[in-house]
């Protein structure tokens, strides 16, 4: 992905490259989007599917079904004439509901997927909007997008949607998403702790070297520090023993 964004030549289908660029653009503009605006939802779809589908940024006008990799129809989306009103109702519910945002965002994700408002790109928009809702509640989620959370759990993700569809309610999907979010948060915390430990280890090592130097010297100057710690860093003033 980095190579694509840096303009380097990448051996990949043009569609894949376009998806990466489109995704980067919309996630860069995440804080500009109103999570309860129909217009912003359509704008997001327009950006994410630009150059990839015939009609971007508009609700579908034909019946659509959700199919699996083998072409089996999993469920049919809402009849197109009802899509705009249902999407507006769902956005209003997300704005006014008193359910905790962690659960509310999961319900929104599932219900928008069920409505299936677009001819293509529904999953990407659902996951983006899930991220947007969470990031409005806690900005940390802007750095932990739902798209990344489910990246390695896609089979479980689609299975949870299918089971919930069969059951006629979203409990299984909500439980899966909350579990995936928790796991990703724990991984992020673990990585942060590891980086902090590594940084602390380097700082401790520098001070140990300085302490050893001061055992045989009365003081240490900035120039001496650079030579002692061996990494080009120095203190702003002399350190005396």
Task: Describe the role of every protein-language-model region.
Residues 1-241:
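FIC/Doc superfamily catalytic core
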